[in-house]
Amino acid sequence: MPTPKKGARLGGSASHQKKILSNLAAQLFENGAIKTTDAKAKLLRPYAEKIITKAKNGTLADRRNVLKLIPNKDVVSHLFTELAPKFEGREGGYTRIIKLENRKGDNAPMSQISLVTEELASKEAERATRAAASKKAAEEKAAEAAEEKDEAAEEK
């Protein structure tokens, strides 16, 4: 991983930032969701998504590369065996950041970053649900129109 060149770093130095991201990613994969500051969550998202993409490939070389980034064998094993198969049908977007209220002590903006393990709805399924909803709405409209005609006929 190249040393970050621009902007402020978490923890001050580039090496400390790498360690922070490594630990945050390990906790994210272990627990599924973590609560952290906005800045850390925004830096963690691409870091974690690249690691998950390597885990999806599942080769020995990828496993070794991930072990260089996250030196916790249990977490890496969990990532490759249990989490990666959940993301097979998904092309990116493995994490979600949800804004939380500011931290009480120093008013730092907080976020929850979590893994998105829900199934992706296929485009065909989405189309089918939209079509069913529009068909139902059309039937209701037709039923209302028929009722209005009946009421108008009864009044005459």
Curated annotation (Swiss-Prot):
Superkingdom classification of source: Bacteria
Give the Gene3D superfamilies listed for this entry: Ribosomal protein L17 (3.90.1030.10)
Record flagged with keyword Ribosomal protein: yes
Q: Which gene encodes it?
A: rplQ
What is the species listed in this Swiss-Prot or TrEMBL entry? Corynebacterium urealyticum (strain ATCC 43042 / DSM 7109)
The text of the family note is:
Belongs to the bacterial ribosomal protein bL17 family.
Record-level GO BP terms: translation
Q: Give the HAMAP family listed for this entry.
A: Ribosomal_bL17
Which GO molecular function annotation, any one, does this entry have? structural constituent of ribosome
Basic and acidic residues composition bias: which ranges?
A: 136-146
Does this UniProt record's set of keywords contain ATP-binding?
Answer: no
Q: What's this protein's name?
A: Large ribosomal subunit protein bL17
Task: Enumerate the UniProt keywords alphabetically.
Answer: Ribonucleoprotein, Ribosomal protein
> What taxonomic lineage is listed for the species of origin?
Bacteria, Bacillati, Actinomycetota, Actinomycetes, Mycobacteriales
Q: Supply the SUPFAM superfamilies for this chain.
A: Prokaryotic ribosomal protein L17
Assembly, per entry: Part of the 50S ribosomal subunit. Contacts protein L32.
**Record-level GO cellular component terms:** cytosolic large ribosomal subunit
What ranges does the record list as Acidic residues composition bias? 147-156
Q: Where is this region: Disordered?
A: 127-156
